[in-house]
From Swiss-Prot:
Pfam families: Plexin_cytopl, Plexin_RBD, PSI, PSI_PlexinA-B, Sema, TIG, TIG_2, TIG_plexin. It is a single-pass type I membrane protein. Interacts with NRP1 and NRP2. Residues 1258-1893 are cytoplasmic. Expressed in the developing nervous system. Widely expressed in both the central and peripheral nervous systems. Expressed in the peripheral ganglia, somatosensory, olfactory, visual, auditory and equilibrium systems. Disruption phenotype: No visible phenotype. Mice exhibit defasciculation of the facial branchiomotor nerve and of the ophthalmic branch of the trigeminus, with variable severity. In mice lacking both Plxna3 and Plxna4, migrating neurons do not show the normal response to Sema3A and Sema3F and do not migrate away from these semaphorins (in vitro). One of its GO terms (molecular function) is semaphorin receptor activity. This is Plexin-A4. GO terms for cellular component: cerebellar climbing fiber to Purkinje cell synapse; plasma membrane. It is found in: Cell membrane. Glycans are attached at residues 654, 1006, 1131, 1179. It comes from Mus musculus. Residues 24-1236 are extracellular. Disulfide bonds join 94-103, 129-137, 283-404, 299-355, 373-392, 509-526, 515-557, 518-535, 529-541, 592-611. The gene is Plxna4.
């Protein structure tokens, strides 16, 4: 159904409402209103998104701007009125919109996005601006949203066609007696000609007035607006200014913006667009926008830059924050939210910061900038508005705080960023909005976040830090939008997301349950209402003004102490006294409660309250089995409020739970031990005897610590124990016993108490099971009277032991602990005690006995059994009786007949010997191991049963044979006998390969890192044997990761990720990693080839308390590629984890019943990740039973086409690393069709056949129309083809004829070389005409003598090498010493040292050597050396060549350079050149090529010379399409052919006079009253416009202003003088350092645009006929080839001259050879032998540093004028020159830039010239220092007096003044400087130069 136009919809709605008698418009279905626990939420229509929000400060009503609707809501978010604004038929390309005039573009139903919503309080109306119809606005009555007006018929009514809600901001400025103003700032979406980016408009009282939204001021020249120039879009095609916030304060209006940087910041290597945030300021009363100033803003914390503005809000400082910041409480503060970095992406970084700016400080910074600019310092610095820097103009005037600018020095930019004060940062949940206010002197900020949370922040928190005191989840999904608003009473906050509007209280005091929590929360709204025991605002607490009723500080909280604070559970009704603090007056009474145990009245006496402990009947509930005490809360309850208002802990303790004396008396409570009753009690009077009471631990009966108690098994022995305070059993009590718990069996032994300090367990034998334990610790307990334990605090144990257990050999027996007294009984051959060995039958050996050596040593094992013949193998020998000391075996070991030296470290007495093999003889092959213990007698000798073999090891191969430089490759080396020996070392060259494992046929090792790409020889060392084979391992450059896709996964991981990079095939076990929450998660990857691999995203392990709907970003994300560290963390990716899909169960029963063929629907959420950019899907697999089904996915459901099954089957969904079963599905079988169903099917089939026949008839008719259309298109294609052929034919003909003509034209032209001084000044100080070094130093007379004396002394210091080097190094180390300063100092030093070039060269060499050292130390690539001009040394090098190559330029290289310049100029002028765009028919630059067929003729005019009327007429070739200015310039070139440019008259100063017959004369001009204007386009006058015929006579006459053209001239001069100074050619001799595009900018005020040959590319309003004449624009690229061919000879000639060692009779300048030799010496010194590096150094040093500068800027050498098209062509030649010097290979394709493709075939031959040139120079004999010094002295002498040395020294000294302390520091501390007293001398200079002296 076609959508109904919105105006008809409104009309019908209105009629319905009137019919129902209602007075308000209501939506058809009331939007949902939902109530959260404490939040009220409003949700609109499902298809609507909310855009803007504003609250009426007078009524509290809310106005909500949404897509297609405006709502008026009550303060509790109930809908009062709605007003529909869309959708409607529109097309963004319709300008003016279709409601004004018919639009040819196709129309479609278009939503109306609300872009601006403002309340005009003065006129009681709402201004609502949308995106429809190029951004028109409605004015609605606040009461009922009745439309008061909707102006749309003028272009001022179209604000902007941008379809984004956050792109427009408006500020209303109110006046009491005049109409208000509306300042509007908007993005323009690439249409700067239609919409100003910032403007001020009229707000008329009458909403339907004609002047509504008209510019406040608008005349022919000036208007209250600023447009973005079209030139800005040529630099950055998608440039726009995004306005984030706006406000008015004082006399100014401010806007905060986000806009692309015109110039990338230093160090930026990426092509990604960099953005900057700026504050824009305008005077409220400024109608011409001369007060426009913009300042960059940002903030930084802990080294992190936050530069992307997200939101802002203006508030006051408040008293507390004001004191911290040093401002008044009512001063304006700007609260801002920035995100990290400067790159604005769809996926902005989550790191963000809340920063504050003091508005007064920003204004002070602007005032400083205005003052400096009006002193003539710096440039206007507004790159987007003034593409070329315009210098500030000086003017004597006073600039105060309210200065509003003049028509000079405006608009103005501030280059230095104003840094805000960062008060809070958030790393994970990006902040997106901010609002702030002051509450009771505290400054509070409320911040919305990306995940829908609200952060409440106290900016003036404790210790000067911001305090985030609460976080609230407000929005269900999505971020909080920028617009937030307070309710009328500031007690509620309205928070908006795209789908909901929520009301949130500014405070939630009620959530805090205690005074400490309440006052410790940091929320200044909250205090403690004491007797109500609640946290609330003060005004909500009853009688809060009375003393101590309301606590607002922690120290005011109620505190209690109770005496006593504990009692025994056996005590009842004890009087307790409570001391109270901070308690209010309690006249109504108070109760004491012990939790729920008991409650009684309290007696209030002053600040004391008396209560009684619970009665006897209530105490049993307190006694517990756990522990000896129970804590209850003793609470005070107010009888006035019935609320508990204070409490303290009270302890009931129970002594009777203790069953030992020590635990009893060491209890913290009043417990006593009754020694004779063996009980613990709180009442000592219950003990039987007075002497039996124990209170101190030292009085307890207890065993004392004894040494180890050793008891051999089966030996009868008593155990004596030391003790103290042992009680004497009383009558009727039993005696003492010892209890030993042996392997779980209790053994009781009678004990005898000798006295109170000794007890003995009687004689008994003990035993335990098993021979695998040689000693067993046993618990020992002493008891009396049957069960009264004696405390054993030392934990004494008895150790039972068996000598024979685990000591089967003599050696092991004698190794036993000597305290065991074990020995070896030889006859039975076992380990026993002496008494168990029969003395008459056997010998008993003990360790301490004489000759106690064990006989019969035995070897059981040797490891290894093979080894290399060279020795060094560590052999491990294991066995029995292998000696008891190392000396026993130290020299008695042989292996296979070879001495093996035992090692002390490996020796284990009696059990193991480790020895190192000596070298074997060739005749030795194998043998046994033989040892002697102490002496080599048979009974002390042993021989192994195993043989030890000597092996020869060989290597065969290694795989893989290449790996990354970082190492980590697992390499397998194959060979024979590789398991021999004990120690293996594998080396790849000098790099170890870490041994992993081996077998007889292979060794596996892991490579370590290498610092360079090299082939390494493989060496294996086994013990002392080195094995070599011709095996080579190749270290290759590390893999790189170029791109991964997608950059997201779900939390459960296993999402497939494609990875592209280089050298990926080197990696054996690639893995992907993500670190989150401190834990690393890894998954596998599979390499496909060298450039591709696939990975499975790692899963994240999130905790159970994690919110499942949150997006996660890992702290680290990267790849584990063997040992490549650089890819462990990928900095350039923002890998994101989205929530896992969540499925719902089919039903509570888990069974879904379906018919066959019915799709199965699985409902859930997060089924499609919310990835920016949209179209992404997860790979779902759904199984029904075992069969998969076809799946269709949407946001909230999976639709599964059920397979051909019947019956009950389980459904399983799998995605990523998770699977889920929503339940079972039951598919019932089909029933057979009934008769009615069959009839229905037959009827439907018949209807279908009829329909198909009708479609076929329609198709036949349509195809006939298509054939006719095809024929028409064929004819048009034929016409186009013929035009293309003609163009190609013309280009070929031009190529053949132009070369001859050009060569003949250039013959004999004089070369206007600049003199040496002018030439050097243009290179050293570009753009500065009258530099101080060209004139005498100007000093007031009274200071002249001292200054000259000081400068002479300073000159001596400059001529001191130690000082000069220290001076330069110190300056370069200063952060504020800019690149411009470095170049300036280098040039000034060279001018001072012009007369001492030998010394200058020596200093330069030293600085270059230092630069090379620094470059290599910082690990930069050597090729980067001298690439840029970032140091004094590099600029000095440029200047050095400038001085020394002047002669070579004049005698040799200047001629081909001038010829090339003239050739380009003449060739360009042979064809049309567009005076507006600078494009030409003939060009080398694609950017400056006219891509259209321009019809033109060549005319020859006869020109009368302006200097001599009687001289012969000069024939001049011109084109009939030339503008009058172009004709004048060609005539001047012809007349003054050999005259330098600076000596010619200017075309602007001359008029062109056409002299017709009969003395008639006519002045021709670019613009006059005959100029044609069509559809806002004004075409410049051409020769054809005036119909000047071939052969006409013209004359150049001096400029005259006549009545005829006065109006026109004044127009041009007024425009030029005000807004467009930067676009007029200035008359200074050096034309420009950059190319200038000739432009005459469209007249912004009148809307008229100028054109010459082609209309500007940005304008889309060319007629169809214009388009038809264009053809395919790329066809005209053949003209580039034609031009290139014409100029080829001149390019070749120049390149050949520069790259020849001897040419045109001139020898190679000595400077070149000398400097190249110096670079070679430095390369040798640092071991750099890579020829590419040396080649690059030389290229960076001379061709790219000097020659490219000369080629691009021939005006540095010649007195010429360079126009923009010539500049563009020279840039192409210079780029070719640079490419020729490069060593890298240029890979070109069809998408490569045309200038690269143009010379692609020539560059290889040019590269050969360069290489030959460098090679020839290298072969030339070296220049001695004497010869070079003589040459330099001669150069110094020739140009000695070119510069004023005193002036140059004075300029250098200005840097001493700026950095005096920093320069003096190193001079004081350096020994060499100290010896020469350089610091003292410099201080003398400073004294002499100071103004005070």
């Amino acid at each position: 159904m076609k959508a109904m136009p919105w105006n008809w919809t409104c009309l019908l709605s209105h009629l319905l409402v009137v019919g129902m008698g209602s007075s308000t418009l209501l939506p058809r279905q009331p939007p949902q209103l939902s109530q959260k626990p404490s939040f009220v939420t409003f949700r609109g229509e499902p298809a609507e998104g909310f855009n803007h929000l504003v609250v009426d400060e007078r009524t509290g009503h809310i106005y909500l701007g949404a897509v297609n609707r405006i709502y008026k809501l009550s303060s509790d978010l109930k809908v009062l009125v709605t007003h529909q604004t869309g959708p409607d038929e529109d097309n963004p390309k319709c300008y003016p919109p279709r409601i004004v005039q018919t639009c040819n573009e196709p129309l479609a139903s278009t939503n109306n996005v609300n872009k601006m919503l403002l309340i005009d309080y003065k006129e009681n109306r709402l201004i609502a601006c949308g995106s429809l119809y190029q951004g028109i606005c409605k004015l609605l009555r606040l009461e009922d949203l009745f439309k008061l007006g909707e102006p749309f018929h003028k272009k001022e009514h179209y604000l902007s066609g941008v379809n984004e809600s956050g792109s427009v901001f408006g500020v209303i400025v109110s006046y009491s007696n005049f109409d208000d103003k509306l300042f509007i700032a908007t993005a323009v979406d690439g249409k700067p000609e239609y919409f100003p980016t910032i403007s001020s408009r009229k707000l008329t009282k009458n909403s339907e007035a004609d002047g509504m939204f008209a510019y406040v001021f608008h005349d022919e020249f000036v208007a209250s607006m600023i447009k973005i120039p079209s030139d800005t879009f040529t630099v950055i095609p998608d440039f726009d200014i995004y306005y984030v916030y706006g406000f008015s304060s004082g006399n100014f209006v401010y806007f905060l913006t986000l806009q692309p940087e015109m110039v990338s910041p230093p160090g930026s290597t990426t092509k990604e667009q960099v953005y900057t945030s700026k504050l824009v300021r305008l005077c409220k009363e400024d109608t011409a926008f001369n007060s426009y100033v913009e300042v960059p803003i940002g903030c930084e914390r802990n080294g992190v830059e936050y530069r992307l503005l997200q939101a802002a809000y203006l508030s006051k400082a408040g008293a507390v924050l004001g004191r911290t910041l040093g401002v008044r409480p009512d001063d304006d503060l700007l609260f801002t939210v920035f995100s990290k970095g400067q790159k604005r992406k769809m996926k902005s970084l989550d790191e963000s910061a809340l920063c504050i700016f003091i508005l007064k400080q920003i204004n002070d910074r602007i005032k400083d900038r205005l003052q400096s600019c009006y002193r003539g310092e710096g440039t206007l610095d507004l790159a987007w508005l003034k593409v070329k820097d315009i210098p500030c103009s000086s003017a004597l005037l006073t600039i105060d705080d309210n200065f509003c600018g003049l028509d000079m020095n405006a608009p103005l930019g501030v280059s230095e960023m104003v840094r805000g004060i960062p008060v809070f940062t958030e790393d994970r949940d990006r902040m997106t909005s901010v609002i702030a206010y002051v509450y009771k002197n505290h400054s509070l900020a409320f911040v919305g976040t990306k995940s829908g949370k609200l952060k409440k922040i106290r900016v003036d928190g404790p210790k000067g830090n911001a305090l985030q005191y609460e976080t609230v989840q407000v929005v269900d999904s999505g971020p909080v939008l920028r617009d937030m608003a307070f309710s009328k009473d500031h007690e509620q906050l309205y928070i908006m997301s795209e789908r909901q509007l929520t009301r949130v209280p500014v405070e939630s005091c009620g959530q805090y349950r205690s005074c400490g929590e309440c006052l410790g929360s940091g929320d200044p709204h909250c205090g403690w209402c004491v007797l109500h025991n609640t946290c609330t605002r003060k005004e909500r607490c009853e009688r809060s003004r009375e003393p101590r009723r309301f606590a607002s500080e922690m120290k005011q909280c109620v505190r209690l102490t109770v005496h006593p604070n504990n009692i025994s559970v056996s005590q009842y009704n004890v009087l307790l006294v409570l001391e109270t603090y901070n308690v209010p007056e309690l006249s109504a009474g108070v109760n004491c409660t012990f939790e729920d145990l008991s409650e009684m009245d309290g007696l209030v006496i002053g600040n004391q309250i008396q209560c009684y402990s619970p009665a006897a009947k209530e105490v049993p509930r307190i006694i517990t089995e756990n522990g000896d005490h129970h804590v209850v809360q003793l609470q005070l309850k107010s009888k006035e409020t019935g609320m508990t208002f204070a409490s303290t802990s009270f302890v009931f303790y129970n002594c009777s739970v203790h069953n030992s004396c020590l635990s009893c008396v060491e209890s913290p409570y009043r417990c006593h031990w009754c020694k004779y009753r063996h009980v613990c009690t709180h009442d000592p009077n219950t003990c039987s005897f007075q002497e039996g009471r124990v209170k101190l631990p030292e009085d307890c009966p207890q065993l004392l610590r004894v040494d180890k108690i050793l008891v051999p098994v089966e030996v009868i022995k008593p155990i004596t124990l030391k003790a103290k305070n042992l009680p004497q059993p009383q009558s009727g009590q039993r005696g003492y016993e010892c209890i030993l718990n042996i392997q779980g069996i209790e053994q009781r032994v009678p004990a005898l108490r000798f006295n109170s300090s000794s007890v003995q367990c009687q004689n008994t034998s003990y035993s335990y099971e098993g021979m695998e334990i040689n000693n067993l610790p046993v618990e020992l307990t002493v008891v009396w009277n049957g069960h009264f334990n004696i405390d054993n605090p030392a934990q004494n144990k008895v150790y039972l032991y068996k000598c024979g257990a685990m000591r089967e050999s003599c050696g092991l027996c004698l190794k036993a602990d000597p305290d065991f007294e074990c020995g070896w009984c030889q006859s039975p051959g076992q380990c026993t005690l002496r008494q168990h060995c029969p003395a008459h039958e056997s010998r008993w050996l003990e360790l301490s006995g004489a000759n106690s050596k064990c006989t019969n040593p035995r070897i059981t094992e040797i490891i290894p059994v093979t080894g290399p013949r060279e020795g060094g193998t560590k052999v491990t020998i294991r066995g029995e009786n292998l000696g008891l000391e190392f000396r026993d075996i130290a020299s008695h070991v042989k292996v296979a007949g070879v001495e093996c030296s035992p090692l002390v470290d490996g020796y284990i007495p009696a059990e193991q010997i480790v020895c190192e093999m000596g070298e074997a003889k060739p005749s030795q092959h194998a043998g046994f191991v033989e040892i002697c213990v102490a002496v080599c007698r048979p009974e002390f000798m042993a021989r192994s049963s195993q043989l030890y073999y000597f092996m020869t090891l060989t290597l065969a191969d290694l795989k893989p044979n290449r790996g990354p430089m970082s190492g980590g490759t697992q390499v397998t080396i194959t060979g024979t006998n590789l398991n021999a020996g004990s120690n293996v070392v594998v080396m790849f060259g000098s790099q170890p390969c870490l041994f992993h494992r081996r077998s007889p046929s292979y060794i596996i090792c892991n490579t370590t890192s290498s610092e360079e790409v090299l082939d390494m020889k493989v060496t294996v060392q086994v013990d002392r044997a080195r094995i070599r084979q011709d095996l080579v391992f190749q270290y290759v450059e590390d893999p790189t990761i170029v791109r991964i896709e997608p950059e997201w996964s779900i939390v459960s991981g296993n999402t497939p990720i494609a990875v592209w990079g280089t050298h990926l095939d080197l990696i054996q076990n690639p893995q992907i990693r993500a670190k989150h929450g401190g834990k690393e998660h890894i998954n596998i990857c599979e390499v496909l080839n060298a450039t591709e691999m696939t990975c499975q995203a790692p899963a994240l392990a999130l905790g159970p308390d994690h919110q499942s709907d949150l997006t996660e970003r890992p702290e680290e994300f990267g790849f584990i590629l063997d040992n490549v560290q650089s890819l462990l963390i990928l900095n350039k990716t923002n890998f994101t984890y989205y929530p896992n899909p969540v499925f719902e169960a089919f039903s509570p029963s888990g069974i879904l019943e379906l018919k066959p063929g019915t799709p199965i629907i699985l409902k859930g959420k997060n089924l499609i990740p919310p990835v920016a950019g949209g179209n992404v899907k997860l790979n779902y697999t759904v199984l029904v039973g075992e069969k998969p089904c076809t799946v269709t996915v949407s946001d909230v459901q999976l639709l599964c086409e059920s397979p051909n099954l019947i019956g009950r089957h389980k459904v399983m969904a799998r995605v990523g690393g998770m699977e889920y079963s929503p339940g079972m599905v039951y598919i019932a079988p089909d029933s057979p069709l009934s008769l009615p169903a069959i009839v229905s099917i037959a009827v439907a089939g018949g209807l279908l056949i009829i329909f198909i026949v009708a479609v076929l008839i329609a198709y036949k008719r349509k195809s006939r129309e298509s054939d006719l259309t095809l024929k028409r298109l064929q004819m048009q294609m034929d016409n186009l083809e013929s035009r293309v052929a003609l163009e190609c034919k013309e280009a070929f003909a031009e190529l053949q004829t132009d070369i001859h003509e050009l060569t003949s034209d250039l013959d004999g032209a004089g070369i206007p070389f600049l003199d040496y001084r002018t030439y050097t000044m243009r290179v050293l100080f570009p753009g500065i005409e009258d530099h101080p070094v060209l004139r005498d130093l100007e000093v007031p007379g009274y200071r002249q003598e001292r200054v000259e004396k000081g400068l002479k002394l300073f000159a001596q210091l400059i001529n001191n090498k130690v000082f000069l080097l220290s001076f330069i190094r110190t300056l370069e180390s200063q952060r504020s010493f800019s690149m411009r300063d470095r170049g300036n100092v280098a040039s000034l030093i060279m001018t001072v040292l012009q007369s001492k070039l030998e010394y200058a060269t020596d200093v330069l060499k030293q600085l270059l050597a230092d630069l090379i050292d620094k470059n290599l130390e910082s690990k930069n690539h050597p090729k980067l050396l001298l690439r840029r001009t970032e140091s004094v040394a590099e600029k000095m090098l440029t200047n050095w060549f400038t001085f020394l190559l002047y002669k070579f330029l004049k005698e040799c290289a200047g001629e081909p350079l001038f010829s090339l310049f003239c050739a380009i100029k003449q060739q360009m002028e042979k064809g049309p050149i567009d005076a507006i765009t600078g494009e030409a028919r003939y060009s080398l630059s694609e950017d400056k090529l006219i891509r259209q067929q321009i019809e033109y003729k060549t005319l020859v005019l006869s020109c009368v010379s302006p200097d001599n009327v009687n001289s012969p007429e000069v024939p001049v070739k011109i084109l009939n399409c030339d503008t009058i200015t172009q004709v004048k310039e060609k005539i001047l070139d012809a007349i003054f052919k050999n005259v330098p440019c600076s000596h010619r008259p200017k075309a602007a100063d001359m008029d062109l006079e056409w002299r017709q017959g009969s003395g008639a004369r006519m002045i021709l001009q670019d613009e006059d009253i005959t100029t044609k204007i069509e559809n806002d386009w004004k075409r410049l006058n051409t020769v054809a416009h005036y119909q000047v015929p071939d052969g006409s006579v013209v004359a150049l006459v001096s400029k005259q202003v006549t009545a005829y053209n006065a109006v026109n001239n004044s127009t041009v001069s007024r425009t030029s003088a005000s807004k467009y100074e930067n676009m007029i050619r200035y008359t200074g001799s050096p034309d420009s350092l950059r190319s200038r595009t000739p432009m005459i900018t469209p007249d912004l005020e009148s809307g008229v645009k100028l054109w010459h040959l082609v209309k500007n590319h940005e304008h889309g309003d060319q007629k169809e006929g214009d388009r038809g004449s264009k053809m395919v624009s790329e066809i005209y690229l053949t003209r580039l080839l034609a031009t290139k061919g014409t100029l080829q000879k001149f390019v070749d000639d120049l390149f050949e001259t520069i790259f020849s060692t001897a040419h045109r009779g001139s020898a190679l300048p000595l400077a070149i050879k000398y400097m190249f030799d110096f670079l070679d010496e430095q390369a040798d010194k640092h071991g750099i032998h890579d020829p590419h590096v040396r080649h690059t150094w030389k290229s960076n040093c001379l061709p790219l540093r000097f020659w490219v500068n000369m080629i691009k800027n021939p005006q540095f050498v010649f007195d010429i004028h360079k126009n923009s098209i010539t500049d563009a062509c020279l840039s192409v030649v210079a780029q070719t020159f640079m490419d020729s010097c490069s060593t890298s290979e240029h890979r070109l394709g069809k998408d490569s830039p045309s200038n690269k493709l143009l010379y692609a075939k020539d560059i290889p031959s040019y590269k050969n010239w360069v290489e030959r040139y460098y090679s020839d120079i290298g072969k030339m004999p070296a220049i001695s220092d004497q010869d070079m010094n003589a040459y330099l002295a001669e150069q110094s002498r020739m140009h000695m007096n070119e510069f004023n040395t005193m002036s140059a020294l004075s300029e250098i000294f200005s840097y001493v003044g700026k950095y005096s302390e920093e320069i003096l520091g190193p001079l004081d501390h350096d020994d060499q400087c100290g010896k020469q007293k350089l610091a003292y001398k410099l201080e003398q200079v400073i004294t002499l130069m100071s103004l005070d002296s």
